[in-house]
Amino acid sequence: MRQSKKLGQCFLKDKNFVKKAINRAELTDKDIVLEVGLGEGALTKELAKIAKKVYVIELDERLKPFADEITSEFENVEIIWSDALKVDLKTLGFNKIVANLPYQISSPITFKFLEEDFEVAVLMYQYEFAKRMAGKPDTKEYSRLSVAVQYNADVEFICKVPPSAFSPKPDVNSAIVKLTKREPKYHVKDEEFFKKVLKAIFQHRNRTIKRALIDSSHEIGIERNILKEILEKIENKFEFTERVFKTPPEKIGYLSNLLYDEI
């Protein structure tokens, strides 16, 4: 079958990386696992050998022959023919996620996952995306993505995966990442406003916090002149001269709360 470029299909073929992903998920026969992207079923089969139940969400119905082969062999596999971004995941009751994700939905599907109550997710991403997810302050990888994902999950970069592990070979390297869900380490008063602040400041990651906020005031829905007045009012409560890329997540959360109290 010819893979769909539109759907970002690169099927994982190398069993060593399949095993590595499964090992890091620490699966047991009590686990209910979600997989997004069936491929030719290499990962699905290995999941089904261990887990109590495997839900696979797949959009491309051309893969039905692979699905039929798997479901005839494993009674604990259920295929959901749909767009993963549109499925109500809360109805599935999974506690772990293991998937070779279609790269073009990496960001939206990750944030959709993080809204769910799971324990562990072991996921394949494009290498550069994975590095940014795990990014730390004062590094080139530190980004809006780093702060947003690490708000309620620990991110562990497992390993780099070469193009040769897939069919067809993608043009980029990939990586396996482990997300462990947890309660936030710091409090934000309004998560949607926090996301707006992240978007605003990381558009100018090399500038000072103050300059970045003013230049992207439209992102947080505050007129520039009003924002300047707010910043003057709270200037003794925050180090606004710090560069965005050096500011740790908890300080950004504190900043978000300061601004939220003033609007």
From Swiss-Prot:
This is Probable ribosomal RNA small subunit methyltransferase A. Its main location: cytoplasm. Belongs to the class I-like SAM-binding methyltransferase superfamily. rRNA adenine N(6)-methyltransferase family. RsmA subfamily. It comes from the Archaea. One of its GO terms (cellular component) is cytoplasm. Its EC number is 2.1.1.-. Coiled coil: none annotated. It is found in: Cytoplasm. Specifically dimethylates two adjacent adenosines in the loop of a conserved hairpin near the 3'-end of 16S rRNA in the 30S particle. May play a critical role in biogenesis of 30S subunits. GO terms for molecular function: RNA binding; rRNA (adenine-N6,N6-)-dimethyltransferase activity. It holds the Pfam family RrnaAD. S-adenosyl-L-methionine binds at residues 12, 37, 58, 83, 100. It comes from Methanococcus maripaludis (strain C7 / ATCC BAA-1331). PROSITE patterns: RRNA_A_DIMETH, SAM_RNA_A_N6_MT. Gene3D superfamilies: Ribosomal RNA adenine dimethylase-like, domain 2, Vaccinia Virus protein VP39. InterPro entries: KsgA/Erm, rRNA_Ade_diMease-like_C, rRNA_Ade_Mease_Trfase_CS, rRNA_Ade_methylase_Trfase_N, rRNA_adenine_dimethylase, SAM-dependent_MTases_sf.
